[in-house]
Amino acid sequence: MARGIFITATGTDIGKTYVTALIIKRLRETNINCGYYKAALSGAERRDGKLIAGDANYVYNIANIKGDPNDAVSYIFQQAVSPHLAAKLNNVEISMERIKKDFYSIKNKYDYITVEGSGGIVCPISTGKERIMLHNIIKIFKLPAIVVADAGLGTINSTILTLQYMKEKNISVKMILLNNYNHKDIIHIENKGYLSDNLLIPVYTCNKNANNLEIPVEKLIEIYEEI
């Protein structure tokens, strides 16, 4: 049976894709068959008439996953807006059945599957015939989660609010990862210390522009759960 994890964040442009790529890369470098999936992607580039799922393309390149990155994303939109708005603008009805079908198809190819969210944890995926929020996808696949947060000013507030929302939705959070971390920045140091001291969740860091995660592979493997 495959094992999975969901990567979400405290907001948009925090570094989910970057962290997701490094996690998958770390596992694949130890010969763990780890794949990638994303339900909806906005802000895709158009090349030669074809939309390119930029986030998936980045992950595939960094983690050395073979195949077409577009196959790892159910819905790809050009407009850089929330998925539900992109779907409206393109007259597309987002379906949970399609998301489930695509997810299980990819899951069957890998021993480990890393699912990346869109935006922050409170993200509308569809407001059409089906009303789908990001947390609905996490719940239907029974995935635990990693929360990616920026290491800088304001992260205590945004991280704790994100965790509170996830607690209300009964989503298990296995790890907090502070991105763009600077070991010499007093704010970053204090933020990590405060979160570590006040939460019952492990807090790790990822240095800015790092090529690898410093998290032990064993710790990453532990947080993936059977799905």
Swiss-Prot record:
Q: Could you say which enzyme class this protein belongs to?
A: ligase
Keywords of the record, alphabetical order, are: ATP-binding, Biotin biosynthesis, Cytoplasm, Ligase, Magnesium, Metal-binding, Nucleotide-binding
Pfam families, per database record: AAA_26 (PF13500)
What family is this protein classified in? Answer: Belongs to the dethiobiotin synthetase family.
* Record flagged with keyword NAD: no
Q: Where does ATP bind?
A: 13-18, 55, 116-119, 179-180
Q: How does it assemble?
A: Homodimer.
What is the role of this chain? Answer: Catalyzes a mechanistically unusual reaction, the ATP-dependent insertion of CO2 between the N7 and N8 nitrogen atoms of 7,8-diaminopelargonic acid (DAPA, also called 7,8-diammoniononanoate) to form a ureido ring.
- In what pathway does it function? Cofactor biosynthesis; biotin biosynthesis; biotin from 7,8-diaminononanoate: step 1/2
Q: Which GO terms describe its biological process?
A: biotin biosynthetic process
Write down the required cofactor(s).
Mg(2+)
Q: Where in the cell is it found?
A: Cytoplasm
E.C. designation(s): 6.3.3.3
Entry annotation: catalytic residues: 38
Residues reported to bind Mg(2+): 17, 55, 116
**What is the gene name?**
bioD
Work out whether the entry's keyword set contains Ligase.
yes
InterPro entries tied to this protein = DTB_synth_BioD, P-loop_NTPase
Designated name of the protein: ATP-dependent dethiobiotin synthetase BioD
Single Gene Ontology MF annotation: dethiobiotin synthase activity
